[in-house]
């Protein structure tokens, strides 16, 4: 019996994954720590206030850039997920009881940090009758109420595709409704066994039909081909996805899916161009791009391309600024 570091029995797939050593990253997988006044201030606020962000706790390489933009990401619903995806670092297990005060605390953290844009994501809560829909919706409402000048992007699980649960989130009116497909149909079941590709597309379509700006993400390097990436982009656009981010898979631990390939920046530029051609209103592609990277900028870009006026209280998000991790920026260095 193989034992995981936290003391539990390792799953068969984890033991098989662990037979492959952690891969050496190529030269283009790198970032520079460029701190500025906003990052320094936020760092101090987070430390003094005992606040928790995904940015810090996941060791995101883009924290310096995003915090300079006054953007951050928060995880709700606990630290354990009821589902297991082969790329995801979040633990799988029995979650803690629902914390109904969490929306208020997240909203207060966003206010304390003075964020311009906040991405709120969370774990799947199949243990709850509503799959956690109330928690997601209430966190949007609480954040908007406490921070009228802050954009809110909500990144949700699929709630098993149930319209009545998704509607709770739609009614809270986030600036962006995001659900990540992550990979292509052929390998989807092995990578995300508790999800379904077509169901994820339908979740995005439901968000589109509710009149929201929709968003998804594709992770490359888990066994897909270039042709399958192009097909998935077409599927997403056909489902009504407005914004797409495309990123390189980085293996969190030996127990996770091995990296099948390292996609060069030049290829990311090609995928970005194809996404633009397909009509996505916002595109961000690069090895270290993450789904919440420069999220406020992408939302503003999508609004303009859709011909929708940006609300006055969020006009500060409408600015053109370089994105260091975008593949085209990497090649220009």
UniProtKB/Swiss-Prot annotation:
The reaction(s) this protein catalyses: [[Fe-S] cluster scaffold protein carrying a second [4Fe-4S](2+) cluster] + N(6)-octanoyl-L-lysyl-[protein] + 2 oxidized [2Fe-2S]-[ferredoxin] + 2 S-adenosyl-L-methionine + 4 H(+) = [[Fe-S] cluster scaffold protein] + N(6)-[(R)-dihydrolipoyl]-L-lysyl-[protein] + 4 Fe(3+) + 2 hydrogen sulfide + 2 5'-deoxyadenosine + 2 L-methionine + 2 reduced [2Fe-2S]-[ferredoxin]
Pathway assigned to this chain's UniProt record: Protein modification; protein lipoylation via endogenous pathway; protein N(6)-(lipoyl)lysine from octanoyl-[acyl-carrier-protein]: step 2/2
SMART domains: Elp3 (SM00729)
SUPFAM superfamilies: Radical SAM enzymes
Keywords: 4Fe-4S, Cytoplasm, Iron, Iron-sulfur, Metal-binding, S-adenosyl-L-methionine, Transferase
Gene3D superfamilies in UniProt: Aldolase class I (3.20.20.70)
Name of the top EC class for this enzyme: transferase
CC cofactor note: Binds 2 [4Fe-4S] clusters per subunit. One cluster is coordinated with 3 cysteines and an exchangeable S-adenosyl-L-methionine.
InterPro entries found in the cross-reference section: Aldolase_TIM, Elp3/MiaA/NifB-like_rSAM, LIAS_N, Lipoyl_synth, rSAM
EC number: 2.8.1.8
Record carries keyword Iron: yes
UniProt binding sites for [4Fe-4S] cluster 1: 55, 60, 66, 292
Amino-acid positions noted as binding [4Fe-4S] cluster 2 in the UniProt annotation, renumbered to this chain: 81, 85, 88
Domain Radical SAM core span(s) in chain numbering: 67-281
Keyword S-adenosyl-L-methionine found: yes
Spans through the membrane: none
GO cellular component: cytoplasm
Localization per Swiss-Prot or TrEMBL: Cytoplasm
Primary subcellular site in the record, as a coarse category: cytoplasm
One Gene Ontology molecular-function label: metal ion binding
Superkingdom of the organism of origin: Bacteria
Required co-factors: [4Fe-4S] cluster
HAMAP family hit by this protein: Lipoyl_synth
Protein name stated in the entry: Lipoyl synthase
Organism: Kineococcus radiotolerans (strain ATCC BAA-149 / DSM 14245 / SRS30216)
Lineage, uppermost ranks: Bacteria, Bacillati, Actinomycetota, Actinomycetes, Kineosporiales
């Amino acid at each position: 019996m193989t034992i995981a570091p936290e003391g539990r029995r390792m799953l068969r797939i984890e033991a098989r994954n662990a037979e492959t050593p952690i891969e050496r990253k190529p030269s283009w997988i790198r970032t520079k720590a460029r701190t500025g006044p906003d990052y320094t201030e936020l760092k101090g606020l987070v430390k003094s206030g005992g606040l928790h962000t995904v940015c810090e706790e996941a060791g995101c390489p883009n924290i310096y850039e995003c915090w300079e933009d006054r953007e951050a990401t928060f995880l709700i619903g606990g630290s354990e997920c009821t589902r297991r995806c082969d790329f995801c670092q979040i633990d799988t297990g029995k979650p803690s009881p629902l914390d109904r005060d969490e929306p208020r605390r997240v909203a207060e953290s966003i206010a304390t940090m003075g964020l311009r844009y906040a991405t709120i994501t969370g774990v799947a809560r199949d243990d709850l009758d509503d799959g956690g829909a109330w928690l997601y919706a209430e966190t949007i409402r609480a954040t908007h109420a406490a921070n009228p000048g802050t954009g809110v992007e909500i990144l949700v699980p699929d709630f098993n595709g149930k319209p009545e649960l998704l509607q709770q989130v739609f009614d809270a009116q986030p600036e962006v409704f995001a659900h990540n497909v992550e990979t292509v149909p052929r390998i989807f079941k092995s990578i995300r066994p508790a999800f379904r590709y077509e169901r994820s597309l339908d979740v995005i379509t439901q968000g589109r039909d509710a009149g929201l700006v929709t968003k998804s993400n594709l992770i490359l390097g888990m066994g897909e081909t270039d042709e399958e990436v192009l097909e998935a982009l077409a599927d997403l656009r056909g489902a009504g996805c407005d914004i797409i981010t495309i990123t390189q898979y980085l293996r969190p631990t030996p127990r996770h899916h091995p990296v099948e390939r390292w996609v060069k920046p030049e290829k990311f530029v090609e995928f970005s161009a194809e996404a633009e051609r397909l009509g996505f209103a916002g595109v961000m592609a690069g090895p270290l791009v993450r789904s919440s990277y420069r999220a406020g900028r992408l939302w503003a870009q999508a609004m303009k391309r859709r011909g929708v006026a940006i609300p006055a209280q969020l006009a500060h998000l409408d600015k053109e600024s370089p994105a260091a991790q975008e593949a085209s920026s990497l090649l220009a260095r």
